[in-house]
Amino acid sequence: LSPSSAASDVYKRQILPEILIDLMEVRNMTIRKAEEKDIPRIIELLGQVLQIHADIRPDIFIPGTTKYTVEELTELLKNKEKPIYVAVNESDVCVGYAFCQLQKQPFSNNMLQFKSLFIDDLCVDQQARGQHIGESLFEHVKKEARKMHCYEVTLNVWSGNTSAEKFYEKMGMKTKERQMEYILDNL
């Protein structure tokens, strides 16, 4: 008997990538929770991400800065509801990260109660792109979200960051809602 088309699609989208990712991890990369020793590299990568955002929105982002300081990262590493996962190479050097936040949708009159794992930031070192590190990190986040009994994995992407949009769509993500703006010119 051959599997149904729907079951085959599920296999291709969910099970097969995890098998391939697991094989990759054994060969040359590991994904683990971030540790204090990773902070200097994470700061470097945060700078790369901020520069991408500053290039897209110079009216909002300040070039040459990072989202977090060393002290803030040290505190974040202690927060179990905001896990940071790092992809490290065979020399245990961080080549990518995923900052996550466990979010709980409380019950209300119009919405069911559920948990989400929000990807606050995902980055792969610009020198290491094209090696499927981003895919590995994303699959790892999905696996962790399942362990936490989350309903979904969510994130935000800045308009204009087309490479990120394409990557997340390739990973199976769909637009859930859009945040829109009207910039006032009175400043």
Question: What residue ranges belong to the model's regions?
Answer:
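Conserved GNAT acetyl-CoA-binding A-motif
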Residues: 146-156
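Conserved GNAT-fold acetyl-CoA-binding loop/helix
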Residues: 50-73
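A short helix-loop-beta-strand connector motif used in the catalytic cores of GNAT acetyltransferases and
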Residues: 71-86
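Conserved acetyl-CoA-binding loop-helix of GNAT-fold acetyltransferases
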Residues: 124, 130-143, 170
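A short beta-loop-alpha structural element at the N-terminal edge
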Residues: 30-44
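Conserved beta-strand in the GNAT
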Residues: 86, 93-101, 123
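Conserved beta-strand-loop-alpha-helix junction that forms the acyl-donor binding cleft
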Residues: 154-164, 181-183
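Single conserved hydrophobic/aromatic residue that forms the stacking wall/gate
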Residues: 1-14
